[in-house]
Curated annotation (Swiss-Prot):
Region G4, annotated ranges: 121-124
HAMAP family reported in the protein's UniProt record: GTPase_Era
Protein name: GTPase Era
Keywords, comma-separated and alphabetical: Cell membrane, Cytoplasm, GTP-binding, Membrane, Nucleotide-binding, Ribosome biogenesis, RNA-binding, rRNA-binding
Domain of life: Bacteria
UniProt: GTP binding residues: 12-19, 59-63, 121-124
Signal peptide: none
A GO term, aspect molecular function: small ribosomal subunit rRNA binding
Length: 295
């Protein structure tokens, strides 16, 4: 039996369920999930292995019109990834006709020779008539080799999606060990978990003005405890107070929720300290972006 392997990227407008889809396939929380757009900032590499194939998923930031240096970085990562892969999955939301955001992305795709699948997400929320209409609209573009409706949250049709991806992969080597699910360092995953909790707890105007850096992560000698310090950067002094909350309650809530997920990730008890620092306009400062892992 021949072994197949290759690289797949998931693209789409911000917040259509790209991270949810990848986490559903891999079976672990690898990419940050939030109800706020543009939550994926780094190219997350995840691995799905079976006996006769291996798929390496690159979950990129949503393609959008950038407003600052961080936004430019996010869009550049997404565009560059299209050139590196064997299959592109274009994920769209349920019940929405082709809007300006989708047209903008398809403009970026029209000269790409990589096989492309249209993945219609959240079919659990739409009826067959709407689904047929959405399929027809995208089929008319002639961009897609496959159109596959799914529910990333509930896992509907994920098996079909995997089979179709594998059918387009070339024969190739096993790039990663079969038990490996991500190449992301634990420090980055810890920072992403903290940022996810901040996105959940904070008001709409603040989340994309924050970043999280794991400044210290150390196993206690002869103990099943990991000490972690994470620094939360925000752009305004007023935001620092909002993040901390009255009597520190909001930051404590973020810390408690993050600690529980980090303990699941590491399989150890965790002592987590969170610090909040003001760094004005960090999203436009190349030095700061580089220190936070944005090349």
């Amino acid at each position: 039996m021949s072994y197949k392997s290759g690289f797949v990227t998931i693209i789409g407008r911000p917040n259509v369920g790209k991270s949810t889809l990848m986490n559903q396939i891999i079976g672990e929380k690898i990419a940050i999930m939030s109800d706020k757009p543009q939550t994926t900032r780094n190219k997350i590499q995840s691995v799905y292995s079976q006996e006769d194939f291996q798929i390496v998923f690159l979950d990129t930031p949503g393609i959008h019109k950038p407003k600052h240096k961080l936004g430019e970085y996010m869009v550049k990562v997404a565009r560059d990834t299209l050139k590196e892969v064997d299959v592109v999955l274009f994920l769209v939301d349920e019940g929405q006709k082709i809007g300006p955001g989708d047209r903008f992305i398809m403009e970026q795709l029209k000269d790409i020779k990589t096989p492309m699948f249209l993945i219609i997400n959240k079919i659990d929320k739409m009826n067959q008539e709407i689904l047929n209409e959405v399929c027809g609209l995208f089929e008319e573009t002639g961009l897609f080799q496959r159109i596959i409706p799914i529910s990333a949250l509930e896992g509907a049709n994920i098996d079909t999606l995997i089979k179709q991806i594998v059918s387009f992969l070339p024969e190739g080597p096993q790039y990663f060990p079969s038990d490996m699910i991500t190449d992301q360092p634990e420090r980055l995953l810890v920072a992403e978990i903290v940022r996810e909790k901040l996105l959940h707890y904070l008001d709409q105007e603040i989340p994309h003005g924050i970043a999280v850096e794991t400044s210290m992560m150390k196993q206690r000698p002869n103990q099943d405890i990991v000490d972690i310090q994470a620094t939360i950067y925000c752009e305004k002094k007023s935001h620092k107070g909002i993040i901390i909350g009255k009597g520190g309650r909001k930051l404590k809530g973020v810390g408690k929720s993050a600690r529980q997920d980090i303990e699941k990730l590491l399989g150890s008890k965790v002592f987590l300290e969170l610090w909040v620092k003001v760094n004005e306009d960090w999203r436009n400062q190349s030095r700061i972006l580089k220190s936070l892992g944005y090349e």
